[in-house]
């Protein structure tokens, strides 16, 4: 999943919005956000998992302490995508279409972009329903777009994506239409 990340750097560099790799990385890993931004991150992650587990039931996968190991790994297993989606795509679409339409377009692009991993045997996505995944993409896009709008930064979005992906190894549940729709609302 590094194509959105790489595209972000190329786009920002080409448009003179960053001078070099160091400035780009500084922009991405700016962790100085107000406490309410991080409260919002935790709130969205808790809502996502509480609803998913409550509606669908769950099994424990990896032990909870593994999050310490899993979370940094998720930076390369999903979180890095946010640099393209929330740092470039969402804000640019918002300039033309406004928040809601931009979020819907971003979620559709994000959903389609993930299609190939549904055909790779052994991935977590190989056993998922692709259309439910699309609803989940819309749900998460709204959460991530809101976090981006509130924080005006991409790091809280990266953290949210890492937490969602990382916790999926610990709290294992099957998505259902009901849980995806309720979470969306």
Predicted feature locations:
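Hydrophobic alpha-helical transmembrane segments
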Residues: 35-42, 67-68, 100-105, 131-135, ...
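Membrane-interface helix/loop boundary segments of multi-pass membrane proteins
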Residues: 80-107, 149-153
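Functionally important transmembrane alpha-helices
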Residues: 128-183
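Hydrophobic/aromatic residues in alpha-helical transmembrane segments
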Residues: 51, 89, 140-144
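Aromatic-anchored segments of alpha-helical transmembrane domains
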Residues: 45-53, 108-117, 162-170
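Specific transmembrane helices
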Residues: 1-78, 149, 169-185
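Juxtamembrane helix-entry segments on the extracytoplasmic side of multipass membrane proteins
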Residues: 59-71, 121-135
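Residue-level hotspots within the lipid-embedded alpha helices of multi-pass solute transporters
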Residues: 42, 46, 74-79, 107, ...
């Amino acid at each position: 999943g590094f194509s959105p990340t790489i595209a972000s750097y190329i786009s920002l560099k080409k448009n003179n919005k960053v001078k070099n790799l160091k400035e780009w990385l500084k922009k991405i890993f700016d962790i100085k956000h107000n406490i309410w931004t991080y409260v919002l991150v935790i709130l969205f992650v808790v809502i996502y998992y509480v609803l998913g587990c409550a509606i669908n039931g769950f099994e424990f996968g990896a032990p909870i302490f593994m999050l310490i190991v899993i979370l940094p790994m998720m930076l390369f297993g999903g979180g890095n995508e946010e640099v393209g989606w929330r740092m470039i795509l969402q804000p640019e679409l918002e300039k033309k279409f406004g928040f809601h339409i931009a979020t819907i377009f971003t979620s559709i692009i994000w959903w389609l972009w993930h299609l190939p991993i549904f055909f790779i045997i052994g991935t977590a996505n190989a056993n998922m329903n692709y259309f439910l995944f699309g609803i989940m993409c819309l749900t998460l896009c709204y959460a991530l777009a809101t976090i981006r709008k509130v924080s005006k930064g991409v790091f809280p979005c990266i953290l949210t994506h890492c937490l969602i992906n990382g916790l999926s190894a610990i709290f294992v549940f099957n998505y259902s239409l009901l849980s995806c729709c309720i979470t969306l609302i």
